Design a protein with these regions (language model features):
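M16 family metallopeptidases and their MPP-like homologs
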Residues: 19, 24-41, 48-49, 66-116, ...
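Metal-associated gating/positioning segment near the N- to mid-region
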Residues: 55-63, 67
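Active-site His/Glu-centered metal-binding helix of metallohydrolases
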Residues: 48-56, 284, 541
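Peptidyl-prolyl cis-trans isomerase
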Residues: 71, 120-123, 127-128, 412-416, ...
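Hydrophobic, small-residue-rich alpha-helical packing segments that form membrane-like cores
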Residues: 127-182, 186-194, 199-201, 206-213, ...
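Flexible, low-complexity linker/tail segments at the boundary of structured domains
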Residues: 191, 671-672
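Proteolytic maturation boundary segments
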Residues: 1-18, 205-279, 284-293, 297, ...
Length: 907
């Protein structure tokens, strides 16, 4: 057990984990983990574990009705983002996240919620009935092709077990008709302290919290007369088991081989022996994944991707999984290729060079983990406690793990690793295959699969060979430049350099993480500078470049050259900018700069990588139209650009217009002049460090530049003006009406005030729709609502509402969408809604100030278009009033541009 965690168990069986942590400061995580889930339902309760989770937010002993949500939103803790829960097959976990701790009463209220979630749910008849509609709409929203396939696959992979019978969301007939007592029976039978753990991690006093937990749960009795929670598992196969599921809306095929194993006995769970075994299994999976990645880069490969992992299949049962995503029509071939690679691993294992690379990666990742042990987020630490309670995962602490890895990893021999790899493959796997229902898909029959498995040991396979890897990224370094000027920008807290070649460099050093440097280089132009006929190639250019390697390395060679380094660099071409983003550890900072240098100076043309990429994209798109949501999203895209000729839908026709020549030409043009870019660095990087200065002057200052500068071209791709409606129907498996409503104005100037008023309008309407559409009408699982302002190519304000519902309810819900908008225009927002959203925005802002990613975004916005969040955000939020919200929304709606896109089921 991590010595930083206070761990204990009360006489009634309640487990608790308490940890002081200040990431972020004055915030805390409160979780209650229940070791119960859908697996414990009886047939007449199918879906009620999940239903019960919903009811926890609909009244408890100390918080009537929506009292939990109302109180915590008043202190900036948002429903959905910070107040939430999930139910799975074997567990249910509730949480209050990022709870402020500056007032003792808030902490006490959070613990009281944990108490009520433990043993004091109200479960009132009228609240149960009101929630039935919400659950049905969640069922509708989640019943996608992948979910339907998963449910059927569970039944075929684990026949005769509880895992075959329970899918969490449950049976709609049960949801509609269950008697109240059925829900209460499940609750009283399984919710008890002996099945529960309280997890509190954050800026709190551990002794005080422990005393409060003991006092709150002192009189909560252990469950009586229900016995211990039964542990259901799945069966071993006495012969290979084949499960095949197809779906009309599936967008691709997937093949999985599952090799089941008994979990280690309880005496070994959480021990050093188990930890060591997990490390070795992880090394095996990493090496096999590396092989799969290399194979997938061959344009002749039968699959677009493959991978493996080792994990829990069910309680008491682990499994090793090999997975492949076949190219359409080559499913049988892909299965055989997957089997071939698994047998190759089983027979010959791996080479020393393969092992050395993954050991280096493991050591460096653990070093970073150790270095950042004091800057880990509360939520991350809380989740470790949940996994310890629910699954028995070891939790020894960063100090122990780092010392153990340093001592043991060098002693892990190739023989040991290969013995573990060999043991992962046995003759009786489960083979699970899913795919679309259409001509041209070549899903192998059960007979073919069984025959291939039987012949596995007769495959002609050669042992892998050792290889030498070139690790020198740049063969000839450029001529070093100089720092031409340097100044400190007080209003944004950044150091600004201009290099001798004209490149602008911005630094904001932080200590939020102990070993992280973030980079972002950006320039105006992007796709707006590209000719219409080149747009298909331009939209895929950065992806093609990334798959092609860089300099004298192809993608596989580059991955091997970077083994053990904690570095990532990616070029992007967006609508109005071109960018390179990156991250690295402190010691790999120069490697990040070298990769950036190569992406500017030596992008690599690789015909084979291009063919592989196009084949992968075509495979993704082969069944795109099977999903009715594709037509829905395409319709929205066309409406947003007034059917401009520059609107490129992501489909097979678009890919046919892509050429490698044009992709390379566009990329080189977009990144032709580094002096047109601003480079932002945030994190553990000190501009006063001579080593940093030398590296920047060499790898940025050494690039060739010009005096040319580019801007953004306005192609007048505006929303279709006026009031527009596009209602249409499509065949679909789950009867659903999908709806998008969007208000747009081009008359509102871009200011911080307008930007934040638009944001808070979206937040307030989200609350209104939660109450009216979800809770009162039971009409939708949720309405996604988003208010925004865009700067380029010209200022634009927008308000988006999107939701799914029963087609029979669509007309009424659409009325409510517009009614809520008009109510705010007429009467202004409710004072409580406005205050809680302002509180939430300021709370989020305070937390964001301690994140490197946020500062990188702040500096991007400041140097791209002059918005200063550090100086202006807080006063702008404080200045928001009911009148400013009312006026902003009225101005938006008065522009007269609103469209509705609605897709109904065809029948």
């Amino acid at each position: 057990m991590d010595p930083e965690v206070r761990y204990g168990k009360l006489e009634n069986g309640l487990t608790y984990y308490i940890r002081h942590n200040e990431q972020p400061k004055q915030r805390c995580e409160f979780h209650i983990a229940q070791a119960v889930g859908a697996i414990l339902e009886e047939d007449h309760q199918n879906g009620l574990a999940h239903f019960l989770e919903h009811m926890a937010f609909n009244g408890t002993e100390h918080f009537e009705g929506k009292g939990i949500i109302n109180y915590f939103e008043s202190v900036g803790v948002n429903f959905g983002g910070n107040i939430n829960a999930y139910t799975s097959i074997d567990e249910t976990v509730y949480r209050l996240s990022d709870v402020p701790t500056y007032r003792e009463g808030i902490i006490d209220s959070a613990l009281l919620v944990m108490h009520d979630w433990s043993c004091a749910l109200s479960l009132l008849d009228e609240e149960i009935d009101a929630e039935r509609g919400v659950i049905l709409e969640e069922w509708r929203t989640r019943r996608t092709a992948s979910r339907r396939i998963w449910t059927q696959m569970q039944a075929k992979m684990y026949p005769g077990t509880q895992y075959a019978k329970r899918d969490v969301i449950g049976d709609t007939a049960v949801i509609n008709n269950f008697e109240y007592q059925a829900l209460r029976d499940y609750y009283h039978k399984w919710y008890g302290p002996d099945n529960q753990a309280i997890i509190v991690v954050g800026d709190i006093d551990v002794d005080t919290i422990e005393a409060k937990i003991k006092a709150l749960w002192a009189n909560v009795p252990r469950r009586e007369n229900f016995g211990e929670r039964p542990i259901y598992t799945v069966n071993h196969n006495d012969k290979p088991l084949v499960a095949i599921v197809t779906d009309p809306e599936a967008e691709g095929s997937r093949i999985t081989l599952e090799y089941k194993f008994d979990q280690l006995p309880d005496d070994y769970r959480g021990t050093a022996q188990e930890y060591m075994l997990n490390i070795v299994r992880g090394l095996v999976c990493n090496m096999l994944d590396n092989r799969f990645s290399e194979l997938a880069l061959d344009p002749k490969a039968s699959f677009t991707g493959a991978g493996c992992y080792y994990g829990e299949a069910a309680k008491k049962m682990d499994a090793f999984y090999g997975i492949t995503i076949p190219k359409e029509g080559r499913e049988t071939e892909a299965f055989n290729d997957l089997l071939f690679q698994l047998e190759k691993m089983h027979r010959y294992g791996f080479t020393q060079s393969e092992l050395d690379r993954v050991k280096s990666e493991k050591l460096n990742s653990m070093e970073k983990y150790y270095n950042e042990r004091n800057t880990r987020k509360n939520i991350t630490l809380a989740r470790e406690c949940i996994r310890h309670f629910e699954d028995g995962e070891s939790m020894p602490g960063a100090q122990w793990e780092w010392e153990f890895i340093q001592a043991v990893l060098p002693m892990v021999s190739l023989e040991t690793v290969n013995n573990v790899a060999k043991a992962l493959i046995h003759p009786n796997p489960t083979v699970a295959i899913s795919g679309p229902e259409k001509e041209g898909v070549n899903i192998p029959s059960e007979e073919t699969i069984i025959a291939s498995l039987a012949d596995q040991e007769n495959l002609a396979i050669e042992a892998p060979e050792e290889e030498e890897i070139d690790t020198e990224l740049v063969k000839k370094a450029p001529r070093k430049g100089k720092i031409k000027s340097s100044k400190y920008n007080e209003e944004i807290d950044a150091t600004e350099w201009v290099l001798s070649n004209g490149i602008k460099v911005i630094f904001h050093p932080t200590e939020f993480k102990a070993d992280e440097i973030l980079m972002r280089a950006f320039s105006k132009g992007g796709l707006s500078q590209v000719k219409t006929e080149d747009l298909p190639s331009a939209q895929l250019a950065s992806y093609i470049i990334s798959m092609s390697g860089i300099g004298h390395f192809n993608a596989t060679q580059l991955e091997k050259a970077l083994a053990g380094k904690l570095v990532n660099v990616n070029p992007e071409i967006n609508d109005y900018t071109e960018q390179i983003t990156g991250s690295s550890s402190i010691k790999d900072f120069e490697t990040m700069l070298q990769l950036n240098y190569l992406y500017f100076t030596e992008p690599r043309r690789d015909e084979q990588a291009y063919e592989t990429f196009i084949a992968m994209i075509n495979n993704q798109l082969a069944n795109r139209d099977k999903n009715p949501k594709t037509t829905f999203s395409d319709s929205i895209q066309m409406m947003n650009t007034n059917h401009s000729e520059r609107t490129i839908l992501f489909n097979s026709d678009m890919v046919k217009r892509v050429t490698l020549d044009r992709a390379m030409a566009v990329y080189k043009a977009r990144f032709a002049n580094p002096a047109d870019f601003t480079f932002v660095f945030v994190g553990n990087v000190n501009p006063d460090d001579p080593k940093v200065q030398d590296m920047i002057c060499l790898w940025l200052g050494g690039m060739k530049t010009s005096k040319a500068r580019e801007g953004i071209v306005d192609h007048h791709m505006t929303v279709t003006p006026g009031q527009q409606k596009n209602y249409f129907s499509r065949p679909m498996e789950t009867t659903t009406a999908s709806n998008r409503i969007q208000y747009t104005s081009y008359d509102m100037p871009f200011t911080m005030a307008n930007d934040l008023n638009m944001e808070i309008i979206g937040r307030i309407l989200s609350t209104r729709y939660l109450e009216s559409i979800r809770e009162r009408e039971g009409g939708s699982y949720g309405v996604g609502t988003y208010g925004f302002m865009a700067v380029y190519p010209k200022p634009c304000a927008g308000l988006i509402m999107q939701f799914d519902t029963d087609p029979k309810k669509q007309a009424r819900l659409m009325e409510i969408i517009h009614e809520e908008v008009q109510t705010i225009i007429a009467d202004g927002p409710l004072a409580t809604d406005l205050q809680k959203e302002k509180e939430s925005m300021l709370k989020d802002y305070q937390e964001d100030l301690e994140k490197n990613t946020y500062w990188r975004q702040v500096l991007y916005r400041y140097y791209l278009y002059g918005e200063n969040d550090i100086r202006d955000y807080k006063p702008a939020v404080e200045a928001i009033t009911a009148e400013t919200v009312q006026a902003t929304l009225k101005e938006l709606v008065s522009a007269g541009n609103v469209f509705e896109v609605v897709m109904f089921p065809e029948n």
